[in-house]
Design a protein with these regions (language model features):
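Short N-terminal edge-element motif at the start of the domain
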Residues: 74-159
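Short beta-strand edge/turn micro-motifs at domain boundaries
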Residues: 144-203, 209, 242-292
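Short, exposed beta-strand/loop patches in secreted or surface proteins that constitute
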Residues: 123-125, 237-239, 261
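Long terminal regulatory regions of eukaryotic proteins
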Residues: 225-241, 245-250
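Bacterial Sec-dependent N-terminal signal peptides
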Residues: 1-51
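Long, acidic/polar, low-complexity amphipathic helices and coiled-coil-like
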Residues: 45-66, 125-178
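Intrinsically disordered, low-complexity segments enriched in polar/charged residues with Gly/Pro
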Residues: 14, 123-124, 136-139, 233-235, ...
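Core segments of small alpha/beta cavity-forming domains
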Residues: 39-107, 175, 182-231
């Protein structure tokens, strides 16, 4: 009943769907640290705001689980306050961008109630289903272009590492347009082609722009392979990172983005910038972009 109520209300509140997934945000940038203030990029912060700020993604995870309080104090696992349900409910709102969710308190509150219920849900670094979106500038055949890299955390021996999962690059997408089904059906090799020593195979190469129409219906272009190929050939040259954000699917029936907010406020740093109720059965197709 509680989950049905959340689903019904969140459908009314959220308004949009998943179109904001690839919207870019500011890159995390640290400055110097004076005694009573710190410069975060171009923003001077007072000491109180600096402590309240969620400065690292690891800190976001600890605060989300209430393994660290809003003042930056880590909580001992043996302490009764560790992952305390009530304290977690009271403090979790600091992890939302309140300039956005201050105007949508219902959705924020339903999320907090859901993740702090008796079957509480926590984030874990090695729990899978959370990804980093790194927007970067490259030179492609001498011209500056934007490219998005999707990274995930992978276990490595006793530790872990970030690995490239997927690439979004408009130039690659142009190579494999979706195409009209009727048009695709015009491009095929006759089932008796083998009896003619595949003399008609030239058809595949006559129109190279649609050569993939002759592949199996299960064919999916691998953009990560194209990415590595272009790098190895020297056609694609890295310049710099422009922005970073995170996409979190770990929480049952929810998706949220975590973006960097650079401002002199206690509500700053890594914060939830987009929250959507998504039943688990609907996540499967979305996750194909993050783990093809």
């Amino acid at each position: 009943m509680r989950r049905q109520k959340i689903e019904d209300r969140s459908k009314k509140i959220r308004g949009g769907w998943f179109s904001t997934l690839l919207v870019l945000v500011l890159l995390l940038s640290f400055g110097t640290m004076p005694v009573s203030a710190q410069s975060i990029g171009d923003v001077q912060m007072d000491e109180a705001n600096l402590y309240a700020m969620t400065k690292q993604m690891g800190q976001f995870i600890r605060r989300f689980n209430y393994e660290e309080d809003q003042f930056g104090n880590k909580i001992n696992p043996k302490d009764p306050a560790y992952r305390n349900k009530q304290k977690r409910q009271q403090s979790m709102s600091i992890l939302f961008d309140q300039e956005t969710y201050g105007n949508q308190p219902d959705l924020q509150q339903y999320f907090i109630e859901d993740v702090t219920a008796n079957d509480s849900t926590y984030m874990t670094f090695l729990g899978g289903r959370w990804y980093s979106e790194v927007s970067a500038t490259f030179k492609y055949n001498g011209k500056e272009v934007n490219l998005i890299m999707i990274l995930g955390v992978e276990k490595e021996g006793l530790g872990s590492k970030w690995v490239l999962n997927n690439i979004y690059f408009s130039e690659f997408n142009k190579l494999f347009p979706t195409g009209d089904l009727t048009e695709k059906e015009k491009h095929f090799l006759h089932p008796m082609s083998h009896e003619l020593d595949f003399m008609n195979i030239y058809k595949i190469f006559k129109e190279p722009e649609v050569a993939e129409y002759y592949a199996s219906r299960s064919f999916e272009p691998n953009y990560l392979t194209l990415f590595f190929y272009e790098i190895k050939k020297g056609h694609l040259v890295f310049q710099h990172v422009d922005s970073v954000k995170f996409h979190v699917f770990q929480i049952k029936d929810w998706y949220f983005e975590v973006s960097w907010f650079n401002r002199n406020s206690s509500n700053a740093g890594w914060l939830i910038s987009n929250l959507i109720y998504i039943p688990e059965k609907d996540k499967k197709d979305l996750l194909k972009f993050y783990e093809p």
